[in-house]
Regions:
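General nucleic-acid-binding
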Residues: 1-61
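Intrinsic-disorder/low-complexity linker and hinge segments
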Residues: 41-48, 73-76, 80-81
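Short, Lys/Arg-enriched N-terminal segment that forms or immediately precedes the first helix
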Residues: 59-75
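Short, solvent-exposed alpha-helical "recognition" segments
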Residues: 77-80, 111-119
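Short, amphipathic alpha-helical "recognition" segments used to contact nucleic acids or chromatin
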Residues: 77-94
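Short alpha-helical "recognition helix" segments of helix-turn-helix
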Residues: 99-100
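Key DNA-contact positions within bacterial/archaeal DNA-binding proteins
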Residues: 108
């Protein structure tokens, strides 16, 4: 996904614009959205509605975490949202160990959630 596509999606989902983010936050959100979209593609063909339903939770968490609006531990009861927030954390420069500690989950769980992004 490119930045313009992500800005439109974030605008449609959350009524936010590019001006609501710093350049760093926007870069993290764009990278996270691209990764989340790739992961959803592995579920096979789906309608736009189905895709939007599956994107909403992880994207909300990625935006909230990237902007510092919510701590990672807030998402531990919802694996999809935790995954979105942790993906944003990786693109913000944090390690898997840092994210696991922040979320209060085991390193093994954080590694499983992050998959190929694990480091």
């Amino acid at each position: 996904m490119n930045t313009e596509t992500v800005i439109k999606m974030v605008g449609d989902f959350f009524d936010l614009t590019a001006e609501d983010f710093t350049p760093k936050q926007l870069a993290v959100i764009t990278d996270a959205a691209t990764e989340i979209d790739k992961r959803l593609a592995k579920h096979g063909k789906m309608t736009t509605f189905e895709k939007n339903v599956m994107l909403y939770g992880p994207m909300a968490a990625a935006v909230d975490y990237a902007c510092g609006c919510a701590p990672l531990a807030e998402f531990t009861n919802d694996d999809a949202r935790l995954e979105g927030a942790m993906i944003a954390g990786i693109y913000a420069g944090k390690t898997t160990a840092q994210l696991a500690e922040e979320a209060g989950v085991t390193l093994a769980k954080a590694s499983r959630i992050l998959g190929s992004l694990d480091f």
